[in-house]
Structures are given as C-alpha cells and as structure tokens.
UniProtKB/Swiss-Prot annotation:
The keyword Transmembrane does not apply. It comes from the Eukaryota. Belongs to the POMP/UMP1 family. PANTHER family: PROTEASOME MATURATION PROTEIN, PROTEASOME MATURATION PROTEIN UMP1. Molecular chaperone essential for the assembly of standard proteasomes and immunoproteasomes. Degraded after completion of proteasome maturation. Mediates the association of 20S preproteasome with the endoplasmic reticulum. A motif (High-affinity association with the preproteasome) lies at residues 68-72. There is a cross-link at residue 39 (Glycyl lysine isopeptide (Lys-Gly) (interchain with G-Cter in SUMO2)). It comes from Homo sapiens (Human). It is found in: Cytoplasm, Cytosol; Nucleus; Microsome membrane. Its main location: cytoplasm. This is Proteasome maturation protein. Keywords: Chaperone, Cytoplasm, Endoplasmic reticulum, Ichthyosis, Isopeptide bond, Membrane, Microsome, Nucleus, Palmoplantar keratoderma, Ubl conjugation. It holds the Pfam family UMP1. It is linked to Keratosis linearis with ichthyosis congenita and sclerosing keratoderma: A keratinizing disorder characterized by ichthyosis, palmoplantar keratoderma with constricting bands around fingers, flexural deformities of fingers and keratotic papules in a linear distribution on the flexural side of large joints. Histological examination of the skin of affected individuals shows hypertrophy and hyperplasia of the spinous, granular and horny epidermal layer.
Length: 141
C-alpha cells in the first residue's frame, strides 16, 4: 500500500537483483561485491598440502593429549604456557631468530631437517635497514 491507500500498480515488476548477470559467464560486480580474491577460491593443489600445513599443529595436539592421559591436566597446561612464553621472546626485527628454545620444547633440537641446511640467515630474502625495521615494529613510522 502506498500513501494514498492504493496498492502498487506494478505487480509484475522485476526485482533489481534478478537483472544482474548470473551463471558461468557472469562478470564480477565491483561496486556491490568488492574486489575478488582468487586465493580464497583456490583449492589445495595436492591432497597432502593441507596435511603438511597442519602437521606441527596436529603433532602438538597429539602430544598434549598423550601427556594429559599419562600425567593429567597440569603437564599440558604447563607446556602450553612455556610455548607461549618462548614464542613471545624474539630478537630485533632485522635479525633472524632460530627459536632454539621452541625446538628444545618440541624435541626438534636432536633432528636434522631440510630447514637446518637450506635456512641460512645470511641468504635471507628479508634484509632491510635495521633502524627502519625497529621503528616499524615499535609503531614509530
């Protein structure tokens, strides 16, 4: 009903949403939907990719559940607090950190992996001006 008490004369009008293109050949509407991000639409390239990305997280969960079953709730809570404390301690932003204490807590200090050989700090891709990097980290820039 409109202000005069009469119904709309355009009963068979088409809504605006149906006027937009749809289907496999639809063009992306930047004004209504914003920029499209291809990264979110991609599927993992290999079935093992997701497993490899979450390997350390799954390993930690398994270790914590085993530790909880053996020693109770205190042991995994203590280890998780130590993990948080160790992850917060870092070097200056322009220096690479090996995070040796985190490796010791996880038990990775006795193993040799490809990251031990191929992760040479002198060949790092991220080399910047030390003063600028510290100022950025402290929020001065």
């Amino acid at each position: 009903m409109n202000a005069r008490g009469l119904g709309s004369e355009l009963k068979d009008s088409i809504p605006v949403t149906e006027l937009s293109a749809s289907g496999p050949f639809e063009s992306h509407d930047l004004l209504r939907k914003g920029f499209s991000c291809v990264k979110n639409e991609l599927l993992p390239s290999h079935p093992l990719e997701l497993s490899e990305k979450n390997f350390q997280l799954n390993q930690d969960k398994m270790n914590f559940s085993t530790l909880r079953n053996i020693q109770g709730l205190f042991a995994p809570l203590k280890l998780q607090m130590e993990f948080k404390a160790v992850q917060q301690v870092q070097r200056l932003p322009f220096l690479s950190s090996s995070n040796l204490s985190l490796d010791v807590l996880r038990g990775n200090d006795e193993t040799i992996g490809f990251e031990d050989i191929l992760n040479d700090p002198s060949q790092s891709e991220v080399m910047g001006e030390p003063h600028l990097m510290v100022e950025y980290k402290l929020g001065l820039l």
